[in-house]
Amino acid sequence: LSIRYNTILVAVDGSDEAKRAFRKAALMAKDHEAKLLLTHIVDTRTFASVEHYDRTIFSEAEQYAKDMLNEYKGLAEKEGVTDVTLVLDYGSPKVKIAKDVAKKHNVDLIVTGATGLNAVERFLIGSVSEHITRHAACDVLIVRTETEQPGAGNDA
């Protein structure tokens, strides 16, 4: 019994966790001959606190996102992924990824990094990966960092 994925979504934000998730998603897309959906959500909540909504800051964030997506697209193509789609959207990343982007593009696997929140942050806001796992209608793969491996560094 083998499971084949047709459309794999990975969200990138410049973090190490996202890079690790991207690498795993690219390898899986190549192995499954699947479409790779690279997405970045510009978190509009971070702009809500900026006085008078500074348009230049927003434009810079948008340009940064476009450049980053194109850079990741190049890396994916170098890895041998032939079908890469870029999605730039706006809003709350955890809501947009799980509900809007995944549904709109018929995603059957979301690959996400295990976000590095401390216990207090996790309690207060919950991690993006946790929200996606709870609310996505498709499979979710959470890619752990080396330091988060169960039992890592516990050579007793």
Stretch-by-stretch model annotation:
Residues 1-3, 74-110, 147-156:
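Structural beta-alpha unit
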Residues 2-55, 79:
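Small/aliphatic-rich secondary-structure junction motif
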Residues 4, 27, 103-151:
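Gly/Ser-rich helix-loop-strand patches that form or flank binding pockets
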Residues 15, 43, 91, 117, ...:
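Residue-level marker for beta-strand->alpha-helix junctions and adjacent short loops that shape enzyme
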Residues 21, 48-51, 96-99, 122-124, ...:
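Short, well-ordered secondary-structure micro-motifs
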Residues 24, 60-72, 96:
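Short, solvent-exposed amphipathic alpha-helices that sit
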Residues 39, 85-89, 141:
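General small-molecule cofactor/ligand-binding pocket signal
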Residues 40-67, 150-156:
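Acidic, proline/glycine-rich short linear motifs
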